[in-house]
């Protein structure tokens, strides 16, 4: 890699980014290791916050430090307005137009086939996250959970004869959205944030004895129940000696982690990992 790479995951609320230095060594792929973070710098901003993209541009400018123009790989689910704002921030950061790949969902990537009825209608973040997970865990059935504004559960299966398939999945309101909806649409229920809900999960009480904790426990149980039910269904149809691997990512992953009763592994951002895999395949 003769030039750095900038990976950008534009979600509904936050923009997450990672910077891969030119010439940085890649982690080895064993198919059994924990998922890597093959970048040297990373960060996140609330993209609608005043001045957030200007601050990001300044940080990226400092990382480039007059060196080669980076190639940029972007996954965007926030729509065209934020896309234009990010384009402007990149021009501000680099003093010109860096080569940008706006990733779209496709029928396949490598040996991973997109099993969606209309492959291009699959949310690009879900597709890219699955690509990233499968790139590093190519022999495993995967339940990819991304806990963001929405919580998505995506399934990747591996055929005995080779090849893999994105089977589809589930979408449910994210933890913050569940908590906020209760507060906004009821007269007397209090507002909770994700951190407060996570502390209730950590308390390990079976039943809540107050309204605050009952809301947190109920929303966490809904999220965890969907994950656990899907994980068990995958296990029932697969190889008992090689259970599915549940991968937990997204901003609310820490809160959900305390509520789950199935084995899981956490990664900071599977979408960035997928963008990295796509960029390397294109090199």
Curated annotation (Swiss-Prot):
Residues in the signal sequence: none
Molecular function GO terms recorded: ATP binding; pantothenate kinase activity
Main location: cytoplasm
Pathway: Cofactor biosynthesis; coenzyme A biosynthesis; CoA from (R)-pantothenate: step 1/5
UniProt-listed GO biological process terms: coenzyme A biosynthetic process
Catalytic activity: (R)-pantothenate + ATP = (R)-4'-phosphopantothenate + ADP + H(+)
InterPro entries: ATPase_NBD (IPR043129), Type_III_PanK (IPR004619)
Subunit structure: Homodimer.
Protein name per Swiss-Prot or TrEMBL: Type III pantothenate kinase
Organism: Cupriavidus taiwanensis (strain DSM 17343 / BCRC 17206 / CCUG 44338 / CIP 107171 / LMG 19424 / R1) (Ralstonia taiwanensis (strain LMG 19424))
Organismal lineage: Bacteria, Pseudomonadati, Pseudomonadota, Betaproteobacteria, Burkholderiales
Designated gene of the protein: coaX
């Amino acid at each position: 890699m003769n030039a750095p790479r900038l990976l950008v995951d534009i979600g509904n609320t936050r923009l997450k980014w990672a910077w891969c230095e030119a010439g940085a060594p890649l982690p080895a792929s064993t198919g059994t290791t924990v998922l890597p973070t093959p970048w040297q710098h990373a960060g996140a901003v609330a993209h609608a916050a005043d001045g957030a993209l200007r601050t990001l541009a300044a940080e990226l400018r400092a990382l480039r430090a007059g060196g080669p123009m980076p190639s940029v790989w972007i996954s965007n689910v926030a729509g065209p307005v934020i896309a234009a704002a990010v384009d402007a921030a990149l021009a501000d950061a680099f003093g010109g137009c860096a080569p940008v790949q706006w990733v779209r969902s496709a029928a396949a990537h490598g040996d991973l086939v997109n099993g969606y009825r209309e492959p291009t209608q699959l949310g690009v973040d879900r597709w890219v996250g699955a690509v990233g997970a499968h790139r590093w865990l190519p022999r495993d059935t995967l339940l990819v959970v991304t806990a963001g504004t929405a919580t998505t559960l995506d399934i990747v299966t591996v055929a005995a004869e080779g090849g893999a398939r994105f089977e589809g999945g589930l979408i449910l309101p994210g933890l913050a959205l569940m908590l906020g909806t209760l507060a906004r649409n009821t007269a007397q229920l209090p507002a909770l944030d994700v951190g407060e809900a996570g502390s209730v999960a950590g308390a390990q009480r079976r039943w809540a004895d107050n309204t605050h904790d009952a809301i947190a426990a109920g929303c966490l149980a809904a999220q965890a129940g969907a994950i656990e039910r899907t994980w068990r269904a995958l296990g029932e149809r697969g190889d008992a000696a090689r259970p599915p691997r549940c991968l937990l990512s997204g901003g609310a992953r820490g809160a959900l982690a305390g509520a789950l009763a199935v084995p899981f592994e956490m990664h900071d951002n599977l979408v960035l990992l997928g963008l990295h895999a796509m960029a390397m395949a294109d090199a």
